[in-house]
Amino acid sequence: MSENKYAELIIDGKSYKLPVVEGTEGEKALDISGLRKNTGYITVDPGFFNTGACYSNVTFIDGERGILRYRGIPVEELADKATFVETAYLLLHGKLPSKEQLQAFSSLLNLNSMLHEDMRHFFDGFPRGAHPMHILSTMINALSTFYPNVDLQSLKEDINLSAARLISQVRTLAAFAYKKSIGEPIVYPRHDLSYCANFLNMMFDSPVKPYEMNTDVVKALNLLLILHADHEQNCSTTTVRTVGSAQVNLYATISAGVSALSGPLH
């Protein structure tokens, strides 16, 4: 909040002070959190084009100036020196992992990459040609029945475990959905492969033609995931925050965000 800076709002001849808030990149906003309490008025802002819903130190993006930073680090630097797994850890914890922390987080991703075997049969219920994003949203929601206790308290106690389950299993779900769409048998995750290599292998390996790992393709996927790791307060993020505010199970919350992401106007 800018020190001693206020905007003056006059309603029916009465003056009200609205604190001026300044972001790290110099953006300015008016704090109207006390508006209704102090004046009895609310604001009308269709589409929330003029509203910042929260304070955040996770991501800064300015498309016009070509700026994207995660936790203050330019995405170009992360793309050059970090992996997607390191970037995910950065977004979760506010700093890049040490060697030991990276090993521990990577191990969690591997240990939680498998789906419950009963979930394989769920894919048989989708019609041929079903939208892959709709399948993904449904299957993520189904995870909430296998992990019913992933709530606010469990997230506070072990954010790494909850995040690892989600980050790892979404990759497995996406690969299974793709294999189902082309009529090929599913490919299970492998602990000896990196995050991106594992995803590619699940997508393109075949019983009749083993997938030959291409390091350039692995690198390209890694860069793609880094660039899309977080994009500030967009529609899907807002959806996740809104649904999650009711203390909904983590997987059901993320499922809602995926549904928002599937929309053509996202």
Model-derived segments and spans:
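Hydrophobic alpha-helical bundle cores within soluble ligand-binding/oligomerization subdomains
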Residues: S2-L265
